[in-house]
């Protein structure tokens, strides 16, 4: 089975594969990246983009749900042993992914482009003790990686949570775009 994401959006395709209890590897190519979604009897149990295993399977799925153009192909078989299987149902992943996508799109107006550098100004505008643990983690990622996309990639939670933290840090002048 193969086709175009423009004709069958990824959420609709995954719902179809779930209800028909298909197994295999769904390869999705958006022209820039290649995503793979591993299915067992209609349930997503793993996913990756460009075989980058440092990004969680859930985060990879949520990111692929943003792809509006490209092609897909379902290849039978391809069972893979993984340490970090997705526990959520396919329907649960889709509902949460679409919700996060909507919220992330609303926040994007407040974010710089994904490839933008991020920096920590000196002196700091406030006290680090005023930050939440999650904001401190994001602050550390800005120090370590210095680019929005890398902060999102390395944040242990969702892209939405990381984006909310970056916006909060920027508003309070803990982080700037140089």
Model-derived regions, located:
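Acidic, Ser/Thr/Pro-enriched low-complexity segments and adjacent helix/loop capping patches
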Residues: 1-178
